[in-house]
């Protein structure tokens, strides 16, 4: 499948655009998988293209598994690019953390007219990184949200993460 690739530095967002064979004014911003061109993303693209929907796959950054202060301006830049391609109907799809991103973006940008959020949170979490720290795979970043807009972190629910007394916060619930 042919695609156009986008980078944060040059285009304002990280992703790939997959155009239908036939003319369509519909597109989905698809945020599943770890990369906009991995197997999961391509599977979603194939399914949507077969149904006449153009697809813009996106992820935070190349192999970036942390989620902290993700600028909603990236979604905004993607929407602007789609509108410049004569796309009039824009949907957004995400799963887990990107499901929360899909809901948040749809609440900010009225150009999004369809939102599918698979297993999102009910609220925006504190931003986090992934790797190895304190015996954990993920850990929160102090003072950072999952998302930001216009340089400001969005309000968030903090994690109860204070090793070694993390367990104490659980018994006081």
Label the predicted regions.
Residues 171-173:
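Conserved small/polar residues in nucleotide/adenosyl-binding loops
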Residues 59-91:
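Catalytic nucleophile-loop/oxyanion-hole region of alpha/beta-hydrolase
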Residues 32-65:
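Short substrate-entry loop that stabilizes the transition state in hydrolases
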Residues 42, 46, 73-76, 80, ...:
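Amphipathic, non-transmembrane alpha-helical secondary structure
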């Amino acid at each position: 499948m042919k695609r156009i690739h986008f980078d944060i530095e040059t285009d304002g967002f990280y992703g790939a655009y997959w155009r239908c064979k036939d003319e369509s004014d519909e597109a989905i911003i698809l945020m599943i998988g770890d990369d906009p061109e991995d197997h999961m993303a391509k599977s979603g693209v194939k399914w949507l293209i077969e149904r006449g929907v153009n697809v813009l796959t996106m992820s935070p950054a190349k192999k970036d598994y942390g989620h902290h202060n993700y600028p909603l301006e990236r979604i905004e830049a993607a929407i602007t690019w789609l509108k410049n391609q004569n796309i009039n109907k824009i949907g957004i799809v995400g799963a887990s953390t990107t499901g929360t991103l899909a809901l948040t973006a749809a609440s900010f940008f009225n150009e999004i007219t369809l939102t599918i959020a698979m297993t999102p949170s009910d609220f925006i979490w504190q931003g986090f990184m992934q790797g190895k720290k304190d015996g954990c795979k993920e850990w929160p970043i102090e003072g950072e949200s999952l998302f930001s807009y216009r340089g400001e972190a969005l309000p968030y629910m903090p994690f109860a993460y204070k090793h070694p007394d993390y367990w104490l916060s659980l018994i006081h619930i």
